[in-house]
Amino acid sequence: MPQKPIQDILKDTKIHQILRPKLMMALPSTKLQEALDLMHAEKTGYIVIADSHSRVVGMFTEREVLMKVLQKGVSMHDPVEKYMRTDVHTLSKSDSLQAAIDAMGAFGIRHIPLVDEFNQVCGILSIRTIVTFLAELFPTEVFNLPPRADQIHETAEGG
């Protein structure tokens, strides 16, 4: 277990320190079927929609698939921009994990595109990456969690 309190770790750790290299991007004109195929092939729950200058113009996530795409009358030939979310919140790689967690909680999102000083996409931070980081930081605590949050055992062995 780390010597510093978790609050300090989250404030001191910068996003670039835990960032994974995977970044899925597409143009707004990408056909809906192509976007869904990309998400399936890459086993990811998001695509950053960026213009030809790599600036974020939207996000297309599993949530958009569930809320907008799984409706009658949707054409798989429509451009993904018709279904993407346009109120996208971004951060930079130098922002803290605490800032990312705060933004995810405040806006109800699980993926945050990262932009550089030119406002171009340079990465993505997902809640999964944050959880993996915390699990690696606190392995004993994570591995000893009960299967259900409300489950309490009298002994360490679970009996």
Segments (PLM) and residue ranges:
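Tandem CBS (Cystathionine beta-synthase) repeat/Bateman regulatory domains
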Residues: 1-159
